Amino acid sequence: MPLRPQEIGSIQSRRDFCKWMGLATLSASMPLWTPPVLANSISSKWLTIESIERVTLNVPFRDIPARAMAKEVPHWVYSEVLQVKLKSGVIGFGETMLFYTWKTTSDEVVKEAIGKNAAEMMWRDDLGAGLQIALFDAVAKSLEVPVHALLGTKIYNETPLSWWNIDTSPEDMAAECKLAHQQGYLAYKTKGRPWFDLWAQMEQASKVVPPEFKIDMDFNDTLLDAERGIPILKQFEHYPQVDIWETPIPQSDIAGNSRIVKEMKAKVAMHYGNPEPFTVFKEQACDGFVLGGTAQTLMNANAACKIADLPFWLQLTGTGITAAWSLHFGGVLSQAKWPAVNCHQLYTHTLLTEPIVVKNGKATVPDKPGLGFELDQDALAKFRTDKPSVRPDPPRMIETTWPDGRRMLLGSHGVLNFILKQANLGNIPYFEHGVTTRLVPNDGSAQWKELYDKAGPEKPLFL
């Protein structure tokens, strides 16, 4: 079990801890890690970027994720796959989730990259996810080494992975947990939301998986504060499957998060970087982190977490392409001890010719050149589509009902995460037993449109 912040073994006293924290704070503005420089003796002809091909895909969700994702994030089906060809003929590939990523790849950076040395460009933070992955893949293939060899020393031969789905009905959550376990996973991450019955979700899911299978829940602030959140969380401590609560309340509430850490048996995770990491370390506001972003971001954050002796899970999301990329970081980052969340389980296809195999909760870190997987060209042809100019956002309306007969309608009205935003504003009733939510099909009728127009975006419509 990972050490909680108050149990950091390398620090012998609170006084030593504070002294160390002072030094750490002084160094917070300095890079903790710098990217390596490949030998200049490598002929530029092997690493010069000759062309970059970009293809937009619409990769369908599986049935259960399709029902769940349709409410707030139907646009997650869109990815851009990039194939970088070097003068040597080597081709590297990568992907960007077009509407959920640390950065998309711009036309300008693609134009700039042509004729440049791939090894000199690959660490840049402005590349966008897909181009960065593709460059690393191409360079590693050219050197006949796995991507992880470009990142550092491999210290783990296997790395833990988590199954992911957004908030669902208790029945669908149990079905997903069961499927995850059948496919070798020992962790499942989902969302904790006041528009679903948390008690029914945990009860049904815990019945279909063994105690060693862990369930992590991301609240995205919806518990609102420690005073109200702690009594809710304590009601789930008897489940052996409960493992990590992510962002139970706003991360800016350092005192509240510190209180939750101290009072909960389960661990607390926060997104790295907000608030400033060394403040979180000092105030013991979490047990570990959620970590995503550029290659340099990941390496630097790992260095900081190593000093603090805190774990994290990698959260690099997309299809199997991004999951393959994540495996290499899982092999070299010492603090990547919690199961990585890649979300590739959502889709009907991994975009790889072979799946990522998980056994006993872990996947093997590839040792073949590049990413260690091959791109499925047939899948690219099958799922190819036009690139949307803006985030696709069809009008959607959800209906939430409670056992006492209350009904709530809320329309999307062009607002991203439109239900979550209302919950964070306190406009949705707090967590209750028996609550459930469904997407109201848009039948094109005047009645549907009338209700939709009344239901938001400023506040939900209660009937």
Where are these regions (language model features)?
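Shared catalytic-loop signature of beta/alpha-barrel
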Residues: V109-K111, A118-A119, Q241, S252-K267, ...
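Metal-dependent enolase-superfamily TIM-barrel catalytic cores that perform enediolate-based chemistry
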Residues: G152, Y156-I260, M264
